[in-house]
C-alpha cells in the first residue's frame, strides 16, 4: 500500500479493526471506519445499504473484518441460533456482492475455526473464504486475537 489510499475497514470498532484503523491513519491513509456501533445506517445486514455501497465504491482497498461475533462465550450461546446464521449470511452476501460489483481489492478476516464443520461460526467463515477466493481477494486467518 504505497502512497495515500482510501481504505474502508468493515468492522472498524472490533478488536482488530480499531487498531488497524488507527495504524492506517497514522500511515497517512484516508480511513473510512464502518461498524454497526457507529449507528444503524452501518448495519451490514440491511440490504440494500447505501452507506455500505458508497463506502466500498469510494475505496481503493477494503479490509473485511466485520462479523456478528463476540468471543467464546458469545459463540457458545448464540452460534446455533437462526439470528446468528442469518446475520452473518446477510452481512457476507451484502459485502461480497458490492466488492464484486465494484471490483475492489480486499482482505477477508477468517478464523482458525473455518475447518470446523460442526461449528456454524466455522462453516460461515469457510463460506467467506470461498467467496473471497472466487473474487480474487486475500484471506487471513486469526488464531486468537484476545491474547
Label for each model-derived stretch:
Residues 69-70, 111-119, 143-146:
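Active-site segment of SDR-like NAD(P)-dependent oxidoreductases
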Residues 5-27:
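N-terminal Rossmann NAD(P)H-binding glycine-rich loop of SDR-like oxidoreductase domains
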Residues 31-52:
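Adenosine-cofactor binding site in Rossmann-like domains, unifying the SAM/SAH pocket
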Residues 49-87:
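NAD(P)H-binding glycine-rich loop region in Rossmannoid oxidoreductase-like domains
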Residues 19-23, 98, 131:
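Rossmann-fold NAD(P)-dependent oxidoreductase module
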Residues 64, 90-123, 138:
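Conserved Rossmann-fold NAD(P)-dependent oxidoreductase catalytic core, especially the SDR/UDP-sugar
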Residues 106, 110-111, 130-147:
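Conserved beta-loop-beta element that borders a ligand/cofactor-binding pocket
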Residues 6, 60-61, 105:
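Structural motif
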Amino acid at each position: 500500500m504505497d502512497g495515500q489510499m482510501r481504505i474502508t475497514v468493515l468492522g472498524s470498532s472490533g478488536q482488530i479493526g480499531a487498531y488497524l484503523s488507527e495504524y492506517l491513519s497514522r500511515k497517512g491513509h484516508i480511513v473510512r471506519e464502518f461498524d454497526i456501533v457507529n449507528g444503524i445506517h452501518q448495519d451490514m445486514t440491511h440490504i440494500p445499504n447505501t452507506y455500505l455501497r458508497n463506502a466500498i465504491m469510494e475505496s481503493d482497498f477494503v479490509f473485511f473484518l466485520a462479523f456478528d461475533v463476540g468471543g467464546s462465550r458469545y459463540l457458545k450461546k448464540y452460534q446455533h441460533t437462526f439470528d446468528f446464521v442469518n446475520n452473518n449470511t446477510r452481512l457476507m452476501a451484502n459485502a461480497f456482492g458490492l466488492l464484486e460489483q465494484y471490483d475492489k481489492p480486499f482482505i477477508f478476516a477468517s478464523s482458525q475455526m473455518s475447518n470446523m464443520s460442526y461449528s456454524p461460526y466455522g462453516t460461515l467463515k469457510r463460506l467467506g473464504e470461498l467467496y473471497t477466493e472466487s473474487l480474487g481477494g486475500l484471506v487471513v486467518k486469526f488464531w486468537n486475537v484476545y491474547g
